[in-house]
Amino acid sequence: MNPAPNLVMIGPMGAGKSCIGRRLAERFGLDFVDVDQAIVEQVGSSIPAIFEQHGEARFRQHEAEALHGLLAQSNKLVSTGGGAILDAGNRQRIRERGFVVYLHVSVPAQLTRLARDRNRPLLQRPDREQVLHGMAALRTPLYQEVADLTLETDHLSPAEATAQLVLRLAAQWRMSSTPA
């Protein structure tokens, strides 16, 4: 089984963290928690409203607080927001308290998946593609820095991605529990 207290899903928006995370949590008997949803419940406002009323910096504070509290627990599958890894403290906490799965998705696939999504404050601009490329350039090395396992999700359905992760996680966890 997972040698870490939690399983943590990281990756850009549109990678499938929440959808695949729910499926994995059910498969492994973990409690699924979406950090963005936890923020909404704690603050009592939607993510777009938090960005509009208080700005991204305040949202990131809420995100760090929620992530810290969730990762203090065990037996959780924690689905992070795409920008959670921007904070060095978040990256450290994620590594310390979770086995980290990085779901990678290309910008063209993100554009397709997020075409009708109006709940992403950072994408409410006409230059969505440029914004996503900029985010990828900044964030991809940070995702790679903390990832224990990476899965490319561009051409996978949620069911296919989940099936691949179940096999890869089981193999990884077996290897980590085998005496040297």
From Swiss-Prot:
Q: Which cofactors are named for this entry?
A: Mg(2+)
Q: How is the cofactor bound?
A: Binds 1 Mg(2+) ion per subunit.
Q: Which residues bind substrate?
A: D36, R60, G82, R139
Keyword Nucleotide-binding: yes or no?
yes
Pathway(s): Metabolic intermediate biosynthesis; chorismate biosynthesis; chorismate from D-erythrose 4-phosphate and phosphoenolpyruvate: step 5/7
* Gene Ontology molecular functions: ATP binding; magnesium ion binding; shikimate kinase activity
Which residues does Mg(2+) bind?
A: S18
InterPro entries to which the protein is assigned, alphabetical? P-loop_NTPase (IPR027417), Shikimate/glucono_kinase (IPR031322), Shikimate_kinase/TSH1 (IPR000623), Shikimate_kinase_CS (IPR023000)
* Catalytic activities: shikimate + ATP = 3-phosphoshikimate + ADP + H(+)
Q: Which keywords accompany this UniProt record? A: Amino-acid biosynthesis, Aromatic amino acid biosynthesis, ATP-binding, Cytoplasm, Kinase, Magnesium, Metal-binding, Nucleotide-binding, Transferase
Any idea of its EC number?
A: 2.7.1.71
Amino-acid positions noted as binding ATP in the UniProt annotation, renumbered to this chain: G14, A15, G16, K17, S18, C19, R120
Matching entries from Gene3D superfamilies are given as: P-loop containing nucleotide triphosphate hydrolases (3.40.50.300)
Coiled coil spans:
none
Q: What class of enzyme is it?
A: transferase
GO cellular component entries: cytosol
Q: Name one GO biological process term.
A: aromatic amino acid family biosynthetic process
Location in the cell reads:
Cytoplasm
Q: Which domain of life is it from?
A: Bacteria
Q: What's its job?
A: Catalyzes the specific phosphorylation of the 3-hydroxyl group of shikimic acid using ATP as a cosubstrate.
Q: Which family does it belong to?
A: Belongs to the shikimate kinase family.
User: What is said about its interaction partners and assembly?
Assistant: Monomer.
Q: What is this protein called?
A: Shikimate kinase
Source organism phylogeny: Bacteria, Pseudomonadati, Pseudomonadota, Gammaproteobacteria, Lysobacterales
Q: What gene name is given for the protein in this entry? A: aroK
